[in-house]
Amino acid sequence: VARGSGQWAAFRLPWRPGQPQNAFVIVKANPSVHVYVSDRSHTGTLTLADTGETRAAKQLEDHDASQLVVKWAAKPFQYRSVCFAVGPETRAFAPDKATDGWLRPYGGPHMWVSEPLAGAAQSPWLQLEWDREQTVGEIRIVFNDDVNKDLINLHHHRTPFEIMPELVKDYRIEAWVDGQWEVVARERDNRKRRRVHRLRRPVRTGRLRLVVESTNGSPAAEVVEIRVYAP
């Protein structure tokens, strides 16, 4: 690493798993090197700190056995993440993740994440397409509400936001009808994880897409699942 600040330090990982899965990268302390920490967390990743202690607090349990799970703490990096970049380009957030049947992280993230909304030429969209036209009567969408949040019911415990930033805020659903996109559903100021849109008039279409207009704070659109049903 060359002397100086604000630079990237590249290194190769010799690990090549047989199938996509989570990876744990341990960065050990070095008095001559510092890592940058961003002011926001990154979906699909966790940043933990080594506490050096493997025993749970005595007042929490009747026993004091060594527990490796308490060795790594998330609290020091709550709502933050170490700055890093990966290459080549990952498919961990590819569009097909929104139709793989998983609603929670398992062996990796299971959601579609768009490119950043800021500066984009057009609103990001997620499209479903069939070999032949279908009659669509209901669309169900599951957005990301980030399961990695420290939330309890004590009144003094507050988050820096009132609505989960990762939730999509404004969006519309369009169907390809007679050679053009037709809006069949629209939502404003969304703050829910799961949305169900029952169409007043079922529509015949071979293509359907979810167009994200804004989020509640996240730089990108994040969609866990989208399902389409007949009337």
Task: Pin down the residues of each PLM region.
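Surface-exposed, short loops/turns at beta-strand junctions within beta-sandwich domains
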Residues: 15-19, 201-204
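A general structural signal for short secondary-structure boundary/capping elements
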Residues: 17, 72-73, 191
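Surface-exposed turn/loop modules enriched in turn-prone residues
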Residues: 1-17, 27-28, 165-180
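PGST-rich, cysteine-poor low-complexity/disordered linker and tail segments that act as flexible spacers
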Residues: 42-104, 118-119
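Helix N-cap / beta->alpha transition motif
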Residues: 1, 12-14, 95-108
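Aromatic, loop-rich ligand-recognition surfaces of beta-strand-rich domains
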Residues: 31-57, 102-183, 189-231
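Short beta-strand segments enriched for Tyr within beta-sheet-rich domains
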Residues: 21-26, 136
